[in-house]
Amino acid sequence: MQAGRLLLRKAWSALLTIGFVLVLNFFLFRVLPGDPARAGIKDPRMTRAAQAAIHARFGLDKPVLNCLASLNPLRRGPCLVSPLQTQFFIYINNLLHGELGISFHTKIPVGELLRARLWNTAVLLSAGQTLAIVLGVAGGVLAAWQAHTRIDYAALIISLVAWSLPTFWLGLILLFWGSRYAGLPIGGQLTPGLAAAGTWAQFTDAARHLVLPTLTQTIIYLAEYLLIMRSTMLDVLAEDYILTAKAKGLSTFQVLKDHALRNAALPIITIVALNLGFTVAGAVQIEAVFSWPGLGQAIFESVARRDYPVLQGAFLLLAVSVIVANLLADLLYSWLDPRVQAAL
């Protein structure tokens, strides 16, 4: 019963947040300066007729809301259209049908453009975050268990140095090392002119291209997870029930696995969920350094081109991903710590 109440409460809160994000996502990219038509074409000789035609093609000739100005600077007169013909209603209606608009630059649907990019970013983030979580948690547990020893001090120093490194700088260093000493590809996702898709050669080539960007992300986030896990594990190991478990004659592995790790892992779950948005933001730098064709690189290119539909679609995907990740983290948190459900 309590679990059901918690699920409904968290799901309702997530839906309200997504609704707010949808409204913010609509207005945020319509108050930005400049004319999207000129930004997409970049032709100073564009006539007013051509500019109006582009506005009509992308729906920018309609009012944002009823009786509010549209993005079309050529429109004059009062706003006498139906609310169903406004940009906001069309935007919501398109979202309900899975449409994110048309790119100003490539003239293809934003959903189609972001789908492939999102998959590439998901592969990169999954590989990097999985390694960072596993190694960071294991390193934090080891450092806490060996507190105030050479192992602990070495883990602290290395983690603090790694955590303070700028993402792009670390990427450039690994790029130089990987290309010169390890023979790894310096950028891209696949070697041009490779065999047909689905072959073993293509899989191994893609894996080699993934090594350096994954390693960059792993080093940055491994340090954070190790430091947090060490701190929380030290607090847990000082609890009375840990001393009782040791007094019962349980092995070190049993004490850590059955009594300490579950409670010490709670802050890590929250940090991983919150890091999702920051991870994608960091992926912009990583994908730019290694020319990885992911969502971060699409955002970087769209900012330079002022391709607002792509930015709007990417912002929406990132926001919804973070909200869903936090919802899952809250539910997992309540499962690991029954006190959360008891507090309802």
Which residues does each PLM region occupy?
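Helix-terminus/capping and membrane-interface signal
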Residues: 13-26, 30, 120, 124, ...
